[in-house]
């Protein structure tokens, strides 16, 4: 995935130093886009190991509409633990907005599937996780925000839109805040997987996944890791195989997915900024 390495290099060479909510500090640019042809392999970063179970389980968790980390923890995925309450609650984050926007019964995922099947030329086939009514305050902790009825964190990947041409399904993600080293490889994999799942449900082939970032940043304590990753040569992309077609987008299981020939360089550890 040379596209991703080019992204890291661009931020490193052109980013401006900025403060941020976490106090860590970043090197930041505004506005960047990457395109991945899903016919040419699954865009899983190979210059470091990506933890596939976390990608898959988190996406299934979003699709379930859950906002409690119990399912994730039961499957040894702990990527949300720092922001949850003692009861495991995260407030009305992604799953809630996808499946029951603003608590008003609007199932955006079901609506998208229906529109793709009945009106694939529509320019309104999109899902928004950004709900101003529940954006948390930066003046109090994530846990305190949850108690007040807000989300623990505002959505970083805020909106995604589907597009059909020549019987191929493409998806474009708009990400307002992009942690280039830790988050973006994960987001690319997650939404590419979702695109494959939606395409299967709608009897479409896959087209492109397009990633569009707003504030794209490398945290100051990730520079050494970024340099290590940039020194590595990308390997051939793996292939995604979906082993069955369930009755609904909501019925997939972890075991339904195989990532064939995922060859990768060793993992690179880095601290997440909370």
UniProtKB/Swiss-Prot annotation:
CDD domains: TS_Pyrimidine_HMase. GO terms for biological process: dTMP biosynthetic process; dTTP biosynthetic process; methylation. Its main location: cytoplasm. It is found in: Cytoplasm. GO terms for molecular function: thymidylate synthase activity. The active site is at 156 (nucleophile). GO terms for cellular component: cytosol. Keywords: Cytoplasm, Methyltransferase, Nucleotide biosynthesis, Transferase. It catalyses: dUMP + (6R)-5,10-methylene-5,6,7,8-tetrahydrofolate = 7,8-dihydrofolate + dTMP. Catalyzes the reductive methylation of 2'-deoxyuridine-5'-monophosphate (dUMP) to 2'-deoxythymidine-5'-monophosphate (dTMP) while utilizing 5,10-methylenetetrahydrofolate (mTHF) as the methyl donor and reductant in the reaction, yielding dihydrofolate (DHF) as a by-product. This enzymatic reaction provides an intracellular de novo source of dTMP, an essential precursor for DNA biosynthesis. HAMAP family: Thymidy_synth_bact. Homodimer. This is Thymidylate synthase. It comes from Francisella tularensis subsp. tularensis (strain SCHU S4 / Schu 4). The lineage of its organism: Bacteria, Pseudomonadati, Pseudomonadota, Gammaproteobacteria, Thiotrichales.
